[in-house]
From Swiss-Prot:
A biological process term (GO) from this entry: L-valine biosynthetic process
Protein's name in the database: Ketol-acid reductoisomerase (NADP(+))
Record GO terms (molecular function): ketol-acid reductoisomerase activity; magnesium ion binding; NADP binding
Binding site for NADP(+): Y25, G26, S27, Q28, R48, S52, D82, E83, Q84, Q85, G133
KARI C-terminal knotted domain residues: 182-327
Amino acid sequence: MVKVYYNGDIQENVLNGQKVAIIGYGSQGHAHALNLKESGVDVIVGVRKGGSYTKAQEDGHQVFTVKEAAAQADVLMVLLPDEQQKKVYDEEIKDQLEAGNSLVFAHGFNVHFHQIVPPSDVDVYLVAPKGPGHLVRRTYEQGAGVPALFAIYQDVSGQAKDKALAYAKAIGGARAGVLETTFKEETETDLFGEQAVLCGGLTSLVKAGFETLTEAGYQPELAYFECLHELKLIVDLMYEEGLEGMRYSISDTAQWGDFVSGPRVVDANVKESMKAVLTDIQNGTFAKEWIVENQVNRPRFNAINANENEHQIEVVGRKLREMMPFVKQGKKKEAVSVGAEN
């Protein structure tokens, strides 16, 4: 059974006298920096000159270049996109680390897949809120918090666990509960969830349903409503009450269809495909492909993205969403995973 830590389980003074540098000031960086500051932690921000730099200054932080921040800090939290971390680490962070520092991440990708190899004389740990930055910030302001994960990769000081928990507490995570994991488990389950269910699996299911209806002669507008628009209603119920609560809230007809038709769509073959996806994550195949794709400036990524954006479901959806002013738009880049823009 997973171990969960709350505020009362965590030492108060572990971060006292420690200067924490937040590297990156996107969705997560913004939330971490403000929450830490309001928890009494000595915080600075390291970011490249530009919009994020100015925004961090406007929020009242001491702002430096990444290299300058890294040179001052005792604790460095790297909150940059996965694909940017290695370059920034190699060029601006690595040579600034001193023995006894803490190198912290919110996702284990680069450490687990050996893109970043920390020196042997620093603590390395992970603190990962299970929610987007704006939610981490909003719940903190409300006196609550978002559950978080923590993991220890390297404990030189003998206090890495205490430091990780203290950090999680300072951003509000221990108000909701902090769960212990490993870099391997966090990285592999996070990637699998994104690929097989939350992003890849879901978008493919939605498109397949839409195409099935339109190819059978149904109007694309109705197909959009049935296969995409109404998804939020169901997901919200699942989010709040689980599968049981969702099924309680829908009609008996819908529930019966769930029971008898769902397993026909997501059958044993789909599960075998999921296992293959997991294997590619575990053995590093996916990571290698993504790293190489970025090294050659993303030709496949960009081509697929452009093609997907012109799928009929997108063309129809843009028009229908204009009819619904209650649907919030314009937040395409709000970070919903742990990585944040710098």
